[in-house]
Amino acid sequence: MITAYHGSPVAFDRFELNTAGDGTGIKFGYGIYLTESEASAVHYSQPRKCALTPDHYLYTVEIPDLTPDNHLVSAQPVAQAIVQATEQKLGQPVPEAVVAHGKEFRKWLGCTLTGAKKAGFDEEKAAAEFLDAIGVIANVWPQAQSKPDGLKNFAIFNPARVKILKCEHIEIEEVKGKWIRIR
């Protein structure tokens, strides 16, 4: 299992997808956004472009281990097992051009499922639901783009795959444009 973190101005006892996209949007796909960086989760406990909210929560969670066949990486090739499962379920081939990058594959899949020309919220949601149904649990990308092999961020498709281990009510302050935890 992987330990990850989530920051929120709201206390809750389980994750739900009905608010997916409310915090930071769906830039990295539809799902529950988690990170291996506690500092990053603390930062995102404060909604963007809003006055300081009175409450901030840091969730420590557990998610399944990543295997080559159970996740997409935004800037890496899609595992052949995922491509094959997608082709089998869709009943059509996946274009070679989209297999080179998880992000392009995800967007192509969403558009294929909805018939849209451009990927938006509905397409990202459709792709996430499809991928979850074939055993793919997440989109994954580097927490810092300059360190592709460093800490990871995750968009988990199914809330049942996220186990909350701890929820802490925290205090934060802004330092040089970042929200940090007051210890």
Identify the function of each model-found stretch:
Residues 1-183:
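Active-site and NAD+-binding cores of ADP-ribose-processing enzymes
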